């Protein structure tokens, strides 16, 4: 499909630079294809679902994956270099995006304070592979000491990261470190809202997908067939898969909290829609025409024009439905992107394609 089909005009004033306070106070647009749009709030979510539905949360935790350092070569002046870690390949090894990547070659040493890495490989689009001088928990501690929180560029380009972001940019249930971007739909959920979900008879389950920096990358291809997704590591354990299968068999709906949870569930889905345990990388790229097998509803934020995430929601609820929903959201003053408002999406009879 042509990528320009997923373009739309978004005023700069629609971009949220801070989250709602408290975090469950954001607005929520309910989108049911073929029905009128409904303006609600995130706190209304328990009433918008029904007892027996199962919400699936991504419990990944954001690490301070942005490292600023210096390239060192014998006899050459140091070159300031920024890297964004995005995929761990071994206890001592990470894939990363570097700036300026064009000045790096295999064998270069990078120093980040007390931490040193060697460039093992230089790939396309600014991607490199780094081998660090320590591994495992020792490397994790060094990254935590030297790294910075990787706020999305559309926020970081407008203001500096500060102490508030250390809390605001983590979900309250984050427990498995490894993401370099937050699963932002989950940022809306407070402990009080989670308790309200429980009281309403809704199930809560957790999966893990370590969100990579590829989520920030623009789609540069003119056609979706020309875009490659970067791999992200995910885990759906057997007990959770069994519980979700049982919930659906009993008439409950599977509600993915965020596109990351949805992508993992669809990666783990069998042809009949049941879930199998999953552990490993996924590069699933969902565009209109995709047939969803495992997910019945989706809680998600409002996404960038021409992004893979807007393509995903267009596949889920229909491209024209989402065009209309986003036009309504912009006109009604909804806040967009990571710190913005939420939507609750339901699928149409089948996703539409131009």
UniProtKB/Swiss-Prot annotation:
> Which pathway features in its UniProt record?
tRNA modification; tRNA-queuosine biosynthesis
Q: Which keywords are on file for this protein?
A: Cytoplasm, Queuosine biosynthesis, S-adenosyl-L-methionine, Transferase
Q: EC number(s) for this protein?
A: 2.4.99.17
Question: According to its UniProt record, where is this protein located?
Answer: Cytoplasm
Question: Could you state one GO cellular component term attached to this entry?
Answer: cytoplasm
The terms under GO molecular function for this entry are: S-adenosylmethionine:tRNA ribosyltransferase-isomerase activity
Check the record and name the Gene3D superfamilies matching this protein: QueA-like (3.40.1780.10)
Q: Which InterPro entries match?
A: QueA, QueA_dom1, QueA_dom2, QueA_sf
Reaction catalysed by this enzyme: 7-aminomethyl-7-carbaguanosine(34) in tRNA + S-adenosyl-L-methionine = epoxyqueuosine(34) in tRNA + adenine + L-methionine + 2 H(+)
**Pfam families noted in UniProt:** Queuosine_synth (PF02547)
Where would you say this protein principally sits, based on its record? cytoplasm
| Membrane-crossing segments per the record | none
Q: Does the keyword Metal-binding apply?
A: no
Q: Which GO terms describe its biological process?
A: queuosine biosynthetic process; tRNA wobble guanine modification
- PANTHER family in the record: S-ADENOSYLMETHIONINE:TRNA RIBOSYLTRANSFERASE-ISOMERASE
Q: What does this protein do?
A: Transfers and isomerizes the ribose moiety from AdoMet to the 7-aminomethyl group of 7-deazaguanine (preQ1-tRNA) to give epoxyqueuosine (oQ-tRNA).
Q: How does it assemble?
A: Monomer.
Q: Which HAMAP family match?
A: QueA
| Similarity annotation | Belongs to the QueA family.
Quote the NCBIfam families the UniProt record gives.
Answer: PRK00147.1 (NF001140), queA (TIGR00113)
- The name this protein carries in UniProt is S-adenosylmethionine:tRNA ribosyltransferase-isomerase
The species is Methylobacterium radiotolerans (strain ATCC 27329 / DSM 1819 / JCM 2831 / NBRC 15690 / NCIMB 10815 / 0-1)
């Amino acid at each position: 499909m042509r990528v320009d089909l997923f373009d739309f005009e978004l005023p700069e004033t629609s971009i949220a630079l801070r989250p709602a306070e408290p975090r469950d106070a954001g607005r929520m647009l309910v989108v049911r294809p073929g029905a009128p749009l409904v303006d609600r709030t995130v706190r209304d979510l328990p009433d918008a679902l029904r007892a027996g539905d199962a919400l699936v949360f991504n419990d990944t935790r954001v690490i301070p994956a942005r490292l600023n350092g210096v390239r060192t070569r014998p006899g050459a002046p140091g070159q300031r270099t920024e890297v964004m870690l995005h995929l761990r390949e071994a206890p001592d090894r990470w894939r990363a995006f570097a700036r300026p990547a064009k000045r790096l070659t295999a064998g270069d040493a990078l120093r980040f304070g007390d931490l040193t890495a060697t460039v093992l490989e230089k790939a396309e689009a600014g991607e490199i592979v780094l081998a660090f001088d320590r591994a495992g928990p020792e490397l994790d501690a060094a990254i935590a000491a030297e790294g910075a929180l990787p706020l999305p560029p559309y926020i970081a380009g407008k203001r500096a990261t500060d102490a508030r972001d250390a809390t605001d940019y983590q979900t309250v249930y984050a427990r498995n470190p490894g993401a370099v971007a937050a699963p932002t739909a989950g940022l809306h959920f407070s402990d009080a809202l989670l308790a309200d979900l429980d009281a309403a008879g809704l199930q809560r389950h957790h999966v893990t997908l370590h969100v990579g920096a590829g989520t920030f990358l623009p789609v540069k291809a003119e056609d979706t067939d020309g875009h490659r997704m970067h791999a992200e590591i995910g885990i759906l354990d057997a007990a959770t898969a069994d519980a979700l299968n049982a919930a659906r068999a009993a008439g409950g709906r599977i509600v993915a909290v965020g596109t990351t949870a949805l992508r993992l569930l669809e990666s783990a889905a069998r042809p009949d829609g049941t879930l199998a345990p999953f552990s490993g990388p996924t590069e699933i790229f969902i565009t209109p025409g995709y047939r969803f097998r495992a997910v019945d509803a989706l809680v998600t934020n409002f996404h960038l024009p021409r992004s893979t995430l807007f393509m995903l929601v267009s596949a889920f609820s229909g491209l024209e439905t989402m065009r209309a929903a986003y036009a309504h959201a912009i006109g009604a003053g909804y806040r967009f992107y990571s710190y913005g408002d939420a939507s609750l999406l339901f699928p149409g009879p089948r996703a539409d394609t131009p």
